[in-house]
Amino acid sequence: RQMCIRDSVYLVARMFPLFIGYAPEVLHWTAYVGAFTAFYAAVVACVQSDIKRVLAFSTISQIGFMLVALGVSTSADPHAGGLGYMASMFHLFTHAMFKALLFLGAGCIIHAVHSNEMSAMGGLRRYMPLTHLTFLVACLAIAGIWPLSGFFSKDEILTACFAFSPVMGWVMTAIAGLTAFYMFRLYYGIFWGAENRELHAAHKPHEAPLTMTLPLGFLACLL
């Protein structure tokens, strides 16, 4: 399903020479639709309690970022236009890494508490230190915090957006702020929120086995 979503970015990128040469208005609409998609999905992610739903809507929002970057490649500034295309492809790769880490981390968490709901979590940093650390790295990356890869790909996207239109630049900056909000809401709720002692007494949370945590460490090092 995740690959099918990313296919839209790949298709626009493959057709980019045709769009830029013969139908640049298509790229304009791609940018506008991408911005709306990024905003709508980010707002929905802010109110989800199922951790997999948060990550799913986050993926939709980040795909919107990539489409916006492709759409603003029609900027009058040739450098900024080329930057938009490159930033989109760069963000496609960085997003693949930190979102893979987030979903694998979510799998470890669900394995530990047998629930997708944040209400069944809270205080897991004491029981799952490695998952906690790697999940934090992924949250920092997707939020665009320096010096992780997400900072550089989002910075390039925002630079291209401001060159295209100051309004588009500020809109995407605000959406980047929303991304940081819902990801740290998720992180805090899982690892620092109020612990559900009744559920944890019935089934004590535990760190995932090495076969599950080793990929987390590997992906965290790539970010």
What are these regions (language model features)?
Residues 2, 6-222:
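Hydrophobic transmembrane alpha-helices and their helix-loop junctions in integral membrane proteins
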